[in-house]
A protein has these predicted regions:
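Flavin-dependent oxidoreductase catalytic cores
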Residues: 1-160
């Protein structure tokens, strides 16, 4: 059985486990702050865009959109927290279905329902929260992941 990462209470314990696996993954003993030169706080250039740090929010499906695929207060609160987190890359913060019958669950965001106004609301929510918490969002990128769940679609599944 593979142990959960949270089980390791120190860098030494994780290092010992990795040694037993014959893994050469380097582990730092302490977590550096941005002021101490953390590599995670360094800018990252991708193509012509430079992102202010290396923290990223990945796409999720929160099962908390409206039944017609629009944002709810719960969903907007999550997006606000994305901004407050300090991550400069929100890489598809939400998986958004392109058509209703391609939704992975009945409470997934739906692109036709969102429309331009809904997309703008999501982007403005994360960007304004980031500016309030960190001063500027000029070096951040916000994107959505457009999805179709194919044979795994469950647009009418029961409550979770």
């Amino acid at each position: 059985m593979v142990p959960r990462i949270a089980r390791f209470r120190s860098a030494a314990a994780l290092r010992a486990h990795l040694a037993a696996l014959e893994s050469a993954l380097p582990i730092d003993d302490t977590i550096l702050s941005a002021a101490e030169g953390s590599p995670m706080a360094m800018p990252l250039t991708i193509g012509t865009r430079t992102i202010g740090n290396r923290w990223c929010i990945h796409p999720m499906e929160g099962w908390d959109a409206t039944t017609d695929g629009g944002p709810t207060d719960t969903l907007l609160r999550r997006w606000r927290h994305f901004g407050i987190s300090g991550a400069k890359l929100v890489w598809g913060g939400e998986a958004v279905a392109v058509v209703a019958d391609g939704r992975a669950n009945p409470r997934q965001l739906l692109s036709p329902t969102l429309g331009e106004g809904g997309y703008r609301l999501l982007v403005d929510t994360v960007r304004s929260a980031h500016r309030e918490a960190h001063g500027s969002d000029a070096d951040s990128i916000v994107a959505l992941q457009l999805t179709h769940s194919g044979r795994f679609s469950q647009p009418a599944a029961g409550p979770r």
